[in-house]
Amino acid sequence: MAMTDPLGDMLTRIRNGAARRKSSVSTPASKLRARVLDVLQAEGYIRGYSEVEFGNGKAELNIELKYYEGASVIREIARVSKPGRRVYVSVKSIPQVANGLGITILSTPKGVMADHQAREQNVGGEVLCSIF
């Protein structure tokens, strides 16, 4: 059966893996997922990720989760824009997460980026998810 929300599935795998204190989780690979993971890594929410290719043309992303003193660095991770209800914002209305302690990840014409980068580049876009 086809997956209706691949990005939402990846975020759920990360949330569940962190709740179970897993060292890593895996998810099917896609360009959008890899770009979101790049932002999560740059912002310090995951240790890193690697892409593993299989012989049948399929690939998987292995995500290394990050912990601080035994607790997950990610307290909350939520999908904002969903397949049935897309959420677009201008640069002036980019939401702040936890009064600036968390980040919002956006898909913009200039690529996938965190909220503070979008404000610096003066660009809005689709709000993919929020992390705290």
From Swiss-Prot:
Keyword Transcription regulation in record: no
Record's keyword annotation contains rRNA-binding: yes
UniProt-listed InterPro entries: Ribosomal_uS8 (IPR000630), Ribosomal_uS8_CS (IPR047863), Ribosomal_uS8_sf (IPR035987)
Gene Ontology terms describing biological process: translation
Keywords assigned: Ribonucleoprotein, Ribosomal protein, RNA-binding, rRNA-binding
GO molecular function annotations of the record: rRNA binding; structural constituent of ribosome
GO CC, any one term: ribonucleoprotein complex
A Pfam family reported for this protein in Swiss-Prot or TrEMBL: Ribosomal_S8
Domain of life according to the entry: Bacteria
Role of this protein: One of the primary rRNA binding proteins, it binds directly to 16S rRNA central domain where it helps coordinate assembly of the platform of the 30S subunit.
Entry similarity comment: Belongs to the universal ribosomal protein uS8 family.
NCBIfam families from the UniProt entry: PRK00136.1
Record-linked HAMAP family: Ribosomal_uS8_B
Record note on quaternary structure: Part of the 30S ribosomal subunit. Contacts proteins S5 and S12.
Protein name as catalogued: Small ribosomal subunit protein uS8
Species name: Rhizobium meliloti (strain 1021)
Name of encoding gene: rpsH
